[in-house]
């Protein structure tokens, strides 16, 4: 699967798909995500694609309601609202869905790079989205997701470190780790703090460039936002912003900018 930010040994690399190189769609890889499978149409109606006009897919995100998208801060830094659009209502980057304009970008005031602490942000849509069978919001979990829980990761991330972007949305079940286990397995404990939740399955499975900002879901509720990892699917944990840790920031930020 995809991911935009990846830690290589102890160094975090931010791979901004739009700013570095254009992501090339490749139907040959449509069934070859890193350990995942093609998501059934409509199975993740909250999933959106953050698009850069003229480039295409750059990051993932989640619809929280008809005006707000939750994503990673590093997907927003350096952009103006007019630089980004949000694709909703489709599992395909080539057809279907609707592109929506954005009128506000907000990210956590204590977002830290290169550790990627507080790597969480919000996008406000210019106009309310119309919900349908393929476009739905997702609730977020206000309590911590359990350790050793099976959670679902979706995204249009690369199928391998240097692979192309799959045309269709990919889905992968992964398992949550304790932060202590995550720090030990990551080999860089400074990158993991209370605001993170980590997942791991095995080598050959995980997030990759382009998944950043996308959703991690547990029992139908949003628990994580893709932040960082070791590219790609190499048997190291992936790190996510822990939504329960930031739920008050999310709530107040939306309320203060409604």
Swiss-Prot record:
What reactions does this protein catalyze? Preferential cleavage: Tyr-|-Xaa, Trp-|-Xaa, Phe-|-Xaa, Leu-|-Xaa
Q: Name one GO molecular function term.
A: serine-type endopeptidase activity
Q: EC annotation?
A: 3.4.21.1
One GO term under biological process is:
proteolysis
Which residues participate directly in catalysis? 74 (charge relay system), 119 (charge relay system), 212 (charge relay system)
- Keyword Disulfide bond among UniProt keywords: yes
Disulfide feature: 59-75, 182-198, 208-232
Tell me the ranges covered by the Peptidase S1 domain, including all copies.
33-255
Q: Which residues form the propeptide?
A: 18-32
The listed locations are: Secreted
Signal peptide boundaries: 1-17
Tissue occurrence? After blood feeding, expression is induced in the midgut epithelium, followed by secretion into the midgut lumen.
Q: Where is this site: Required for specificity?
A: 206
Query: Record's superkingdom?
Result: Eukaryota
Q: Which UniProt keywords apply?
A: Digestion, Disulfide bond, Hydrolase, Protease, Secreted, Serine protease, Signal, Zymogen
Keyword Protease listed? The answer is: yes
**Top enzyme class of this protein?**
hydrolase
Q: Which GO terms describe its cellular component?
A: extracellular space
Q: Which family does it belong to?
A: Belongs to the peptidase S1 family.
Q: What is this protein called?
A: Chymotrypsin-2
This chain's source organism reads Anopheles gambiae (African malaria mosquito)
